[in-house]
Amino acid sequence: MREVAAAAGISRATLYEYFGTKQVLLRAIATRVEDEIQSAVVDAVAAQPDLAVRVEVVILAMFRFGTAHPDALKVLNVEPEFSINSIHHAFPAFLEVVEPLLVPALELAPSVQSGAMSPGALAELLLRVAATTFFVSTDDPDGMARSIAAWPLLHGSPSS
């Protein structure tokens, strides 16, 4: 809390007045990050609604959020147990917002059209894979987003 107060330019007493404990502060940070990443994804899809690139747009918005907000990702490294629990807790709400954005594009995927997966299951799988990059970072978020969007689950295997 001392470091946070110093970084914010406020006294520890003021910080404790608003947040009480480190856990309350972390929860407030997590809630803000959850809201902002959801908004970033929704805004990215609104700016580029083409279904042909929808998966890449969603994944890239997630990755770029991390790049644009490195302090949010620092919390993941400083408090990994809290971060894992927070992501686990937030994932259902994130999925509820983002799945409807992905489903129209995923309905065109060969794995969905063949009946191997539902569009909702494929959306959840993609979002879970993308979420792991918050713990195993990449120096090339754009390339990673393109790699995930190019999965055979979405486009079929080279032999199909």
List each model region and its residues.
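Residue-level recognition of oxygen-bearing side chains
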Residues: 21-24, 50, 71
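Amphipathic alpha-helical segments that line or abut small-molecule/effector binding pockets
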Residues: 52-67, 120, 124, 145-149
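Amphipathic C-terminal alpha-helical segment
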Residues: 64-68, 104, 108, 124-143, ...
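Helix-turn-helix
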Residues: 1-24, 28
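Amphipathic alpha-helical segments used for helix-helix packing
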Residues: 66-91
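Amphipathic alpha-helical packing segments from all-alpha helical-bundle domains
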Residues: 35-38, 83-113, 117-124
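Alpha-helical structural segments
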Residues: 7, 24-46, 57-61, 96-100
